[in-house]
Amino acid sequence: MARKGSVSQRRVLWLQVFGLAAVQGAIALTWVIYNLYLEDLLVTLGFSAALATTLLVIENAMGAVMEPLMGSFSDQRQHWVGSRFPQIALGMILAAICFLGIPLVLLVGSSVKALLPITLVAWALAMTVFRSPALSLLGRYAFEADLPQAASVLTMVGGVTGAMAPLAGDFILGMGPLAAFIIGTVVLLSAAFVLRQVHPNQSVSAAASLETNAATPWANLPWILGTGAGVALGLRLLLGNFPAAVAKTGFGQPKLIMGALFLTVAISALPCGQLATRLGNRLTMLIGLAGLVVAAGLTSLMATPGIAILVAISIGIAFSLIGNGTLP
């Protein structure tokens, strides 16, 4: 008879993986909404548009420092309490409150304008409380050899959600900040509820759970943090410049090609997960990194819309190869 909290008959707990994918989708959606509205919110209250870049740098720096700390604290809670979910739930509730508070500051007006940057940073900080502990649950839901397949589901959800920025950005902006941020808040809280309903403390086996909690995070932490930070920064710079490079080819709708890029991430996620299962996660990530470097080099050489589409597809596949491995 299996021990409570462990399921030794299955190599991947797909129900729990899908619950975790709901959290990943909520994280991605809130960041899409945040990035779409950030500059407009700041300018509306009289701040410089350049402050948006400064805030993103601060938030990325906070994430690099806080996520490992929150992961370590979550490990301690797992050891002493037997569950990471209380920290995850608390973080998601705090993040939802801060996220909803962002447009409310705008409604109050310029008399409390100083609260806007504080609320923006507070939301980003609240996101670090639960993201690392939540995604670390993936190690409980699959044996090591099957982790790329499980991670590919999260990568697919992230790709579909990321495609909303270029393909549905105008629609989201048309809703207005209050409606958009309310939707993001509801989705975030709903994802927490879904994760709770799928019994997040389950694991493929007690032995695998103990091994993952005790050894794997610390052994892989430099690799995960270094690769994740480097890829995130490089991809942000690449995607920031890619629409302008597409426009130079004469194509009038760069957003469509950006949408194709993110949809490629989603479509290729599962096949890339299968490939990573066969080749090993680290080798697959290195192949993806090499492909991303080559695609980035080709960006400056794009002469026609057709080449731009091929480069976008290449970037999407490369990101799928990398994404499965950078998930904790």
Language model features: what each stretch is:
Residues C98-V105, S110-F130, I307-I322:
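Hydrophobic core of transmembrane alpha-helices in multi-pass small-molecule transporters
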Residues R84-G101, L283-L298:
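Structural signature of the two symmetry-related core transmembrane helices
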Residues T128-A142, L321-P328:
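Intracellular juxtamembrane helix-capping segments at the cytosolic ends
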Residues A2-N60, N220-T227, V231-K248:
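Helix-loop boundary and gating motifs at the non-cytosolic
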Residues G63-A64, P148-D170:
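Glycine-rich segments within core transmembrane alpha-helices of 12-TM secondary carriers
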